[in-house]
Amino acid sequence: MEAFAVAIQSVINDSGFLAFTTGNAIMILVGLILLYLAFAREFEPLLLGPIAFGCLLANIPRNGFEEGVMALISAGISQEIFPPLIFLGVGAMTDFGPLIANPKTLLLGAAAQIGVFAALGGAMMLGFTAQEAAAIGIIGGADGPTSIYLATKLAPHLLGAIAVAAYSYMSLVPLIQPPVMKLFTTQKEREIVMEQLREVTRFEKIVFPIVATIFISLLLPSITSLLGMLMLGNLFRESGVTDRLSDTSQNALINTVTIFLATGTGLTMSAEHFLSLETIKIILLGLFAFICGTAGGVLFGKLMSLVDGGKTNPLIGSAGVSAVPMAARVSQVVGAKANPANFLLMHAMGPNVAGVIGTAVAAGTMLAMLSNH
């Protein structure tokens, strides 16, 4: 009987209840709210769902995640394995044709990165270090894997808050962007009908990822793993002879890696890391970054329209953030409301895919400036 009592006491002592804190309770509530938003409201369910469940797991005391499969999942993020693999799948799903057909839209993708640097400046004004500010600023690029990649490099203690902000705002693009787009454009500008894009040859589509990889990687070697995998996936898509690799990259592989990446991100959301004033600042700075990025793209679109005599609809500039293809769809919806004959989707895909490259370049630039400081 005494042995039984000792065993019971041992179970009680080892249980998580004795180590359970108010912070754990709050974070489990946060996880439940995120699960509701993901599955009931369909806010980025493929990403917020696993992140939210990872948050629940991270706040179970004495969970033993220092070893075993959970440790390997966490290592996949800290060792920068998962983000490049996600980019491989993204590349296989991306059509760079609209960008190749209208190269000047690359400038719109670059202009939208103003949100990244505006948030960087704002974060430094709020007391964050340069490295932390850079990791926060990249939220404005609307690119979850790049946000996770840069946060892991520069501010791993902020990874959970940055990832949640990035993916939350990506899901809210249809709500955040239209008011900004309408604020900075006139009815006449929104009604502009753009000429149909030229047809892009297979040769151009094959050469583009090769040339882009060589040039950009030589310029910013620190993002070679991200950009290289993005372009490799695209090469699988466009070569015409690697259909199996392309199919695996854009389906089975990216789905599998997404589970591990998102769950591993959620595992960083322990109470001691997430419950702070900094988290609130990051959420607000993320919104500021999105608004500035959208405004920057639209304003540069207005400038292009002025220069080319009204051939460019400024609305496609908002697609310069790299939320693919959501931002391009928003441009299409807003343009169609202004002029039902308007079809901006393919035009907006140019700056949209340029934004993917632009965000990676912005991340590489900040890494080059800050990683050794």
Swiss-Prot record:
<keyword id="KW-0472">Membrane</keyword>
<feature type="transmembrane region" description="Helical">
    <location>
        <begin position="257"/>
        <end position="277"/>
    </location>
</feature>
<comment type="function">
    <text>Tunnel subunit of the sodium ion pump methylmalonyl-CoA decarboxylase, which converts the chemical energy of a decarboxylation reaction into an electrochemical gradient of Na(+) ions across the cytoplasmic membrane, thereby creating a sodium ion motive force that is used for ATP synthesis. The beta subunit catalyzes the decarboxylation of the carboxybiotin carrier protein and the coupled export of Na(+) ions. Can also convert malonyl-CoA into acetyl-CoA.</text>
</comment>
<feature type="transmembrane region" description="Helical">
    <location>
        <begin position="343"/>
        <end position="363"/>
    </location>
</feature>
<dbReference type="Pfam" id="PF03977">
    <property type="entry name" value="OAD_beta"/>
</dbReference>
<feature type="transmembrane region" description="Helical">
    <location>
        <begin position="38"/>
        <end position="58"/>
    </location>
</feature>
<keyword id="KW-0915">Sodium</keyword>
<feature type="transmembrane region" description="Helical">
    <location>
        <begin position="132"/>
        <end position="152"/>
    </location>
</feature>
<keyword id="KW-0813">Transport</keyword>
<keyword id="KW-0406">Ion transport</keyword>
<keyword id="KW-1278">Translocase</keyword>
<dbReference type="GO" id="GO:0006814">
    <property type="term" value="P:sodium ion transport"/>
</dbReference>
<feature type="transmembrane region" description="Helical">
    <location>
        <begin position="81"/>
        <end position="101"/>
    </location>
</feature>
<keyword id="KW-0812">Transmembrane</keyword>
<feature type="transmembrane region" description="Helical">
    <location>
        <begin position="17"/>
        <end position="37"/>
    </location>
</feature>
<protein>
    <recommendedName>
        <fullName>Methylmalonyl-CoA decarboxylase subunit beta</fullName>
        <ecNumber>7.2.4.3</ecNumber>
    </recommendedName>
</protein>
<keyword id="KW-1133">Transmembrane helix</keyword>
<dbReference type="InterPro" id="IPR005661">
    <property type="entry name" value="OadB_MmdB"/>
</dbReference>
<comment type="subunit">
    <text>The methylmalonyl-CoA decarboxylase is composed of five subunits: the carboxyltransferase alpha subunit (MmdA), the tunnel beta subunit (MmdB), the biotin-containing gamma subunit (MmdC), and the delta (MmdD) and epsilon (MmdE) subunits.</text>
</comment>
<comment type="similarity">
    <text>Belongs to the GcdB/MmdB/OadB family.</text>
</comment>
<feature type="transmembrane region" description="Helical">
    <location>
        <begin position="280"/>
        <end position="300"/>
    </location>
</feature>
<keyword id="KW-1003">Cell membrane</keyword>
<keyword id="KW-0739">Sodium transport</keyword>
<dbReference type="GO" id="GO:0018801">
    <property type="term" value="F:glutaconyl-CoA decarboxylase activity"/>
</dbReference>
<dbReference type="GO" id="GO:0005886">
    <property type="term" value="C:plasma membrane"/>
</dbReference>
<feature type="transmembrane region" description="Helical">
    <location>
        <begin position="106"/>
        <end position="126"/>
    </location>
</feature>
<feature type="transmembrane region" description="Helical">
    <location>
        <begin position="156"/>
        <end position="176"/>
    </location>
</feature>
<feature type="transmembrane region" description="Helical">
    <location>
        <begin position="206"/>
        <end position="226"/>
    </location>
</feature>
